[in-house]
Amino acid sequence: MIVIVVGGGASGFFSAITCASTNKNAQVIILEKTDKLLSKVRVSGGGRCNVTNACETISEFAANYPRGKDVLEKAFSIFNNQSTIDWFKKRKVLLKTEHDGRIFPISDNSQTIVDCLIDEALKHHVQIKKRSAVTS
């Protein structure tokens, strides 16, 4: 089975990693139209990468996303902010919670998250193709 993931951002990488790690026979390929991977991750949180937020409930977490709150509540019931924290912890990326509830890598450097996502993708044999625009 060949799985194509369009976009080399955080969602694309996470989807590709999840697919490759749960479907050992899948050939997973990320297609990124530019020559830069995870560019929004690099600038998120002023270059520190705001990974997630420390919210008590799924409803509180979904409220941070004004469009599509109901859809997000359903998605967050499957994989939420604590799932994200646990996912990075399992990969030895330590996170910290700031007073306003934003969660960052302890390094205060988005490169920590970028490296983790790229390393995890390569560990699961995800192929990454830059400058590969999808036109139709």
Predicted regions and their residues:
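N-terminal Rossmann-like FAD-binding beta1-loop-alpha1 element of flavoenzymes
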Residues: 2-30
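Short N-terminal binding/cap micro-motifs at the start of the first secondary-structure element
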Residues: 12-14, 37-40
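Glycine-rich active-site loop/strand segments that organize a redox cofactor
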Residues: 46-97
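Short beta-strand to alpha-helix junction loop
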Residues: 72-82, 99-119, 129
